[in-house]
């Protein structure tokens, strides 16, 4: 048994984690933010980093320090809630949305520019068959994920992206563009909300388990040494993400004069790469996107396989991986636009719950791990995050929306769940003072 993880292994696992986080959405959103924020890009990307890097890092640390998985953290409210929440979480960042999205995004950017005269449905089917075939093969043996992803795919991807961003930095396409309306008032806060789109706070409490298992596979099992190694790997991934996000946001912010106000992140990347490198730029970008999507897909399929085979012992890891991969292949062939449209309402509803679970895991010693605090806080948060999900689905809340906009702080900014969550936690704690706490968390977990 090792008492510490060698620096080399720490770096490899850190880059593996970076690769798992740095999926399709992570590459698309910063340039989109940059072009929209213009002169306010630095304030906006600062807010983006809080939710796109800070929250995921907290999720990794929470898993490392508590020694629990996603269900273990959610069980602190109640085991039934823990199971339901974790199943929804894995389905959302797994075969329903995130995994199919990796295939469709890599197709849109890595394949479409080079396809002419081929029917879209046929080309998408062929591409996703190959993409998920590779995913399936590499996910079948998770013990090799660290070496394959950390040693091979990540350096290739990082080098490609580095070439693009360095070219944009040293030979900028123009000055910082004009600020769009969305980023004029509160650019930091707008960037903060945009960071939700990465889904990385959700993924962090899943990927955290992958990191813990990777460290254990290197012979480090003592709890403190294990936690320290996981935190170091998390910091390495966070630093890598920060550099890439800031660079891509700058690329977007300086792109308007050269390529026009494109708006969509994928198109900004494609047009900017072509502007900077010519036809070679599309090849470079396509390779980077495909590798990024592939590494994320492998990590998500692996995590889903481990979780559901544990939840349902009758299903082996291989069977679950097969089901998840095939289902993802089917969903991917509905196309990127449909996947995103279906995912936003569900993510809007569950993302705040994940944030609350992560934050409470750091401070639960203060309120003596009382379940009532977890339950009341999650109820307060969930009621209003569900409203966000309903609005995101396109349904009108009518007079209720008007009332909440006028009376609930932060509601108009999309995080009206914050105050109800805090009030719920306080109410839960006060209740325990009058009626006594229920069983301690360590008795029910």
Swiss-Prot record:
List the InterPro entries hit by this protein, alphabetically: Brnchd-chn_aa_trnsp_Livcs (IPR004685)
Which NCBIfam families does this one have?
livcs (TIGR00796)
User: Where mainly found?
Assistant: membrane
Family to which this protein belongs: Belongs to the branched chain amino acid transporter family.
Q: Which GO terms describe its molecular function?
A: L-isoleucine transmembrane transporter activity; L-leucine transmembrane transporter activity; L-valine transmembrane transporter activity
Designated name of the protein: Branched-chain amino acid permease BraB
The coiled-coil regions, if any, are: none
Taxonomically, which superkingdom?
Answer: Bacteria
Free-text disruption phenotype from the record: Mutant is still able to take up isoleucine, leucine and valine.
Instruction: Please state where this protein is localized.
Output: Cell membrane
């Amino acid at each position: 048994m090792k008492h510490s993880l060698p620096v080399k292994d720490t770096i490899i696992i850190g880059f593996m984690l970076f690769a798992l986080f740095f999926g399709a959405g992570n590459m698309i959103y910063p340039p989109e933010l940059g072009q929209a924020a213009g002169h306010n890009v630095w304030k906006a990307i600062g807010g983006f980093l809080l939710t796109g890097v800070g929250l995921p890092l907290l999720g990794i640390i929470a898993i490392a320090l508590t020694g629990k998985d996603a269900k273990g953290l959610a069980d602190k409210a109640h085991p039934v809630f823990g199971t339901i929440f974790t199943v929804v979480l894995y389905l959302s960042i797994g075969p329903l949305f995130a995994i199919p999205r990796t295939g469709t995004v890599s197709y849109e950017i890595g394949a479409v520019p080079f396809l002419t005269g081929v029917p879209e449905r046929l080309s998408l089917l062929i591409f996703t068959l190959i993409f998920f075939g590779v995913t399936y093969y590499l996910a079948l043996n998770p013990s090799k994920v660290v070496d394959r992803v950390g040693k091979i795919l990540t350096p290739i991807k990082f080098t490609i992206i580095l070439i693009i961003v360095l070219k944009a930095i040293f030979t900028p396409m123009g000055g910082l563009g004009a600020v769009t309306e969305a980023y004029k008032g509160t650019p930091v806060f707008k960037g903060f909300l945009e960071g939700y789109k990465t889904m990385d706070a959700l993924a962090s409490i899943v990927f955290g388990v992958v990191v813990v298992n990777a460290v254990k596979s290197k012979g480090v099992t003592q709890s403190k040494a294990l936690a320290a190694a996981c935190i170091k790997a998390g910091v390495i991934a966070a630093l890598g993400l920060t550099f890439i996000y800031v660079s891509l946001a700058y690329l977007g912010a300086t792109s308007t004069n050269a390529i026009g106000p494109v708006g969509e992140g994928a198109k900004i990347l494609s047009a900017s790469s072509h502007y900077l490198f010519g036809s070679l730029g599309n090849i470079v970008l396509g390779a980077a996107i495909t590798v990024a999507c592939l590494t994320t897909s492998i990590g998500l399929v692996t995590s889903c396989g481990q979780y559901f085979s544990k939840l349902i012992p009758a299903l082996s890891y291989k069977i679950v991986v097969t089901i998840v991969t095939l289902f993802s292949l089917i969903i991917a062939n509905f196309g990127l636009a449909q996947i995103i449209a279906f995912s936003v309402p569900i993510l809007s509803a569950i993302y705040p719950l994940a944030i609350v679970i992560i934050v409470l895991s750091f401070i639960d010693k203060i309120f003596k791990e009382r379940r009532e605090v977890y339950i009341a806080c999650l109820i307060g948060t969930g009621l209003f995050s569900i409203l966000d999900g309903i609005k995101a689905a396109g349904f009108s809340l009518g007079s209720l929306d008007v009332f909440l906009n006028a009376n609930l702080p932060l509601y108009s900014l999309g995080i009206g769940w914050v105050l109800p969550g805090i009030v719920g936690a306080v109410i839960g704690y006060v209740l325990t003072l009058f009626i006594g706490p229920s069983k301690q968390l360590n008795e029910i977990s």
